[in-house]
Amino acid sequence: MNRGGSSASASANYLLCTNCRKVLRKDKRIRVSQPLTRGPSAFIPEKEVVQANTADERTNFLVEEYSTSGRLDNITQVMSLHTQYLESFLRSQFYMLRMDGPLPLPDRHYIAIMAAARHQCSYLINMHVDEFLKTGGIAEWLNGLEYVPQRLRNLNEINKLLAHRPWLITKEHIQKLVKTGENNWSLPELVHAVVLLAHYHALASFVFGSGINPERDPGIANGFRLISVSSFCVCDLANDNSIENTSLAGSNFGIVDSLGELEALMERMKRLQEDREDDETTREEMTTRFEKEKKESLFVVPGETLHAFPHSDFEDDVIVTADVSRYIEDPSFGYEDFARRGEEHLPTFRAQDYTWENHGFSLVNRLYSDIGHLLDEKFRMVYNLTYNTMATHEDVDTTTLRRALFNYVHCMFGIRYDDYDYGEVNQLLERSLKVYIKTVTCYPERTTKRMYDSYWRQFTHSEKVHVNLLLMEARMQAELLYALRAITRHLT
């Protein structure tokens, strides 16, 4: 791969509106570029992130201590809106990429590339192409999967399943990897690889959900670069639709309506907390509510435009560049609803039967020393992180809201908590937020700024980044639970 030009070419992914789709059908050679939007995010005004970074010396210390690139990249800048979480994130990522472990350093970065490619995340691919070469990786491997050792290629199946349908992973997939003669994986190596795959699938969700901009590359003339899918359609470029302009357009939904939505949400949260004290819901009723929510998630269409975004004419077509496709096999394989229409007996992962705390943590720690502690700290940090605020309101208990976000992600992956009332999900998560969650979690490359702007319009960008952190960690934990359960079954 040409390192100097890879960012430009690999970012050439567009979510197309109807008119642009028609144009591209006539001339597929179209190539459009625009100046980068300023700042680390195409969704968040630069000044909000810069102010946070300037005010917090802790961020700079963490970058010096744990950054593999040695600089304050755009992901870190956006995450620095939540410095407590950032420390847990950087420590765990640094450990899996740079500290002692079963896998060679270059292999770790190549696995990160393979994971990011499942979601066409050119930002992460470009980052780890550089890291792969810096750690002594063989440049020829960057020509595509056919140039890498068969042992690495054998990860394709589990990479594909983890990224899109982790519930399909079985002990047979594990056995195939650990019993393949000279190309076999040891269990510690496989656990390391699984942790990396899950981490970078989930991180791709954060990149797209937060509108992370490509890193500025002084080698690109005039500051031009092909824009990534997460921000705009190509027709926005001709109309000079910047982040400021699209933010103004989003305000047309109505400030009064959004204020009413906020008050209504807070009232529902308060009522749920009061009702829980007198709750006598049976276990059977909770199971019924889970099945209902699981089936209803079928009708939450990712990237949905007709119902949730009436002023948008986006369609689902995405152009995948060769720079991305060289790192994946079976590119058409994607997320499929766990609860498919027409199925009566839907297999469910009961969280109580295989929990992270009681099963996954001990297994991963036994086979890949200490990573379990770091991941556990990160999961707990994001789940419990709160400033007791909602938009302009203070002293608010957001526990029910955070739990609903986390459990809704797991519900879409078929994971049920027996002690959770899934009726709370419908009461707390509005339809536009459900569309956003499903898109970011299951089809992150389809995320647009309009989706980001459409939900919780009175909330701060910091609060929306917090949502993205919850979605990212919920997704990573779901992938790990399925993979580690399969490894456990292989061992027993």
UniProtKB/Swiss-Prot annotation:
InterPro entries hit by this protein: AhpD-like, Sestrin
EC code(s) of this entry: 1.11.1.-
Any one GO MF annotation of this record: oxidoreductase activity
SUPFAM superfamilies: AhpD-like
Keyword Cytoplasm applies: yes
Reactions the enzyme catalyzes: a hydroperoxide + L-cysteinyl-[protein] = S-hydroxy-L-cysteinyl-[protein] + an alcohol
Disruption phenotype annotation: Liver-specific Sesn3 knockout mice display insulin resistance and glucose intolerance. Sesn2 and Sesn3 double knockout mice display insulin resistance and glucose intolerance. Triple knockout mice lacking Sesn1, Sesn2 and Sesn3 do not display an embryonic lethal phenotype since they are born at an expected Mendelian ratio. Moreover, they are not distinguishable from their wild-type littermate. However, their survival at 10 days is dramatically affected.
Subunit structure and binding partners: Interacts with the GATOR2 complex which is composed of MIOS, SEC13, SEH1L, WDR24 and WDR59; the interaction is not regulated by leucine. Interacts with RRAGA, RRAGB, RRAGC and RRAGD; may function as a guanine nucleotide dissociation inhibitor for RRAGs and regulate them. Interacts with the TORC2 complex; through RICTOR.
Protein name (Swiss-Prot/TrEMBL): Sestrin-3
